[in-house]
């Protein structure tokens, strides 16, 4: 059974505790970064894919790029926040396939994750999660059926938090899959269209779009391949 304190901590995560990654500078030596484990924030290209790894620096997390669309992440210590994964430097209404293993212990998400600007929006299409269901701490405003499951649609607001445009106040859009999975295809256009029908309009300019693992005050491991 989850304790009351754990529930309060989990509820705060979606409401504003999870720290969104700011745009980290692209490394000057991407070939070196591709071949070593990362423990501090970085972005770049690896195996023909864009990658983004952000950490608040307070937890024990290691991110490693593999061949093509593969990456791995492990985290310990039950503290701190990170987000990392592979995908594309510019998002779009693409179909994204992924497969792999995802073994969280505590608060964590596996999702298609990205940003837009004008306006500034952070979005999640959550495919799997750890002990905390992110849809439990916000009001469901709709749903969409896509890729073999129903997704709950949520909207939250972040105030004076890190973003791809520095510290800012912005909306978060969420689709949370009701039948969790660790492999499959995500048709992002279906989610974007469903959000728009509910008045959740993405920005006119797409920033990066990745299949990400995120952890908050938890531990675990994952190995994901994106295509």
Curated annotation (Swiss-Prot):
Question: Where is each GH11 domain found?
Answer: 37-227
Q: Which GO terms describe its cellular component?
A: extracellular region
Region entry Necrosis inducing domain, spans: 112-136
Disrupted gene: phenotype observed: Causes only a moderate decrease, about 30%, in the level of extracellular endo-beta-1-4-xylanase activity and in the growth rate, but affects virulence, delaying the appearance of secondary lesions and reducing the average lesion size by more than 70%.
pH-dependence note: it reads:
Optimum pH is 4.5-5.0.
**Compartments, record wording:** Secreted
The annotated thermal profile of this protein reads: Optimum temperature is between 38 and 42 degrees Celsius.
Which top-level group of life is the source organism from? Eukaryota
**What is catalyzed by this enzyme?**
Endohydrolysis of (1->4)-beta-D-xylosidic linkages in xylans
Please name the GO terms that the record assigns under molecular function: endo-1,4-beta-xylanase activity
- The EC number(s) given in the record are 3.2.1.8
Query: Which pathway features in its UniProt record?
Result: Glycan degradation; xylan degradation
Give the active-site positions: 122 (nucleophile), 214 (proton donor)
Q: Name one GO biological process term.
A: xylan catabolic process
Q: What is the effect of changing residue 122 to S?
A: Does not affect the pathogenesis
| Keywords attached to this entry | Carbohydrate metabolism, Glycosidase, Hydrolase, Polysaccharide degradation, Secreted, Signal, Virulence, Xylan degradation
- Recount the UniProt induction comment for this entry: Shows constitutive expression during the early stage of tobacco leaves infection. Expression is not affected by the fungicide carbendazim.
| InterPro entries named among the record's database cross-references | ConA-like_dom_sf, GH11/12, GH11_AS_1, GH11_dom, Glyco_hydro_11
Signal sequence residues: 1-36
Uppermost EC category: hydrolase
Notes on how activity is controlled: Significantly inhibited by the wheat xylanase inhibiting protein I (XIP-I) and the proteinaceous endoxylanase Triticum aestivum xylanase inhibitors I (TAXI-I), whereas no inhibition is detected with TAXI-II.
Q: What does this protein do?
A: Endo-1,4-beta-xylanase involved in the hydrolysis of xylan, a major structural heterogeneous polysaccharide found in plant biomass representing the second most abundant polysaccharide in the biosphere, after cellulose. Required for plant infection and the appearance of secondary lesions. Is able to induce necrosis on leaves, seedling growth inhibition, induction of a ROS burst, electrolyte leakage, cytoplasm shrinkage, autofluorescence, cell death, and induction of defense genes, and this abilities are independent of the catalytic activity.
Give the PANTHER family listed for this entry: ENDO-1,4-BETA-XYLANASE A-RELATED
Please provide the record's free-text comment about the domains of this protein. The 25 amino acids necrosis inducing domain is localized at the protein surface where it mediates binding to the plant cell surface as well as induction of the necrosis on leaves, seedling growth inhibition, induction of a ROS burst, electrolyte leakage, cytoplasm shrinkage, autofluorescence, cell death, and induction of defense genes.
Q: Which family does it belong to?
A: Belongs to the glycosyl hydrolase 11 (cellulase G) family.
Q: What is the protein name stated in its UniProt record? A: Endo-1,4-beta-xylanase 11A
What gene codes for this chain? xyn11A
């Amino acid at each position: 059974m989850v304790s009351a304190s754990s529930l309060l901590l989990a509820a705060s995560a979606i409401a504003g505790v999870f720290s969104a990654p700011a745009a980290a500078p692209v490394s000057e030596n991407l070939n070196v970064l591709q071949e070593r484990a990362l423990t501090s924030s970085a972005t770049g290209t690896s195996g023909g894919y864009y990658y983004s790894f952000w950490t608040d620096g307070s937890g024990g997390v290691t991110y490693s790029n593999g061949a093509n669309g593969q990456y791995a992440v492990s985290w310990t210590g039950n503290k701190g926040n990170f987000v990392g994964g592979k995908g594309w430097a510019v998002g779009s209404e693409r179909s994204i396939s992924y497969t792999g293993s995802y073994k969280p212990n505590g608060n964590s998400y596996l999702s298609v994750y990205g940003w837009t600007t004008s306006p500034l929006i952070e979005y999640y299409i959550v495919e799997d999660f750890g002990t905390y269901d992110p849809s439990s701490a916000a009001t469901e405003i709709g749903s969409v059926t896509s890729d073999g499951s129903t997704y709950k649609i949520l909207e939250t607001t972040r105030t004076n938090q890190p973003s791809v445009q520095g510290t800012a106040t912005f909306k978060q859009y969420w689709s949370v899959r009701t039948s969790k999975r660790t492999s499959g295809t995500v048709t992002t256009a279906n989610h974007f269209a469903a959000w728009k029908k509910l008045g959740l309009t993405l920005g006119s300019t797409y920033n990066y779009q990745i299949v990400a693992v995120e952890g908050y005050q938890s531990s675990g491991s994952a190995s994901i391949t994106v295509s």
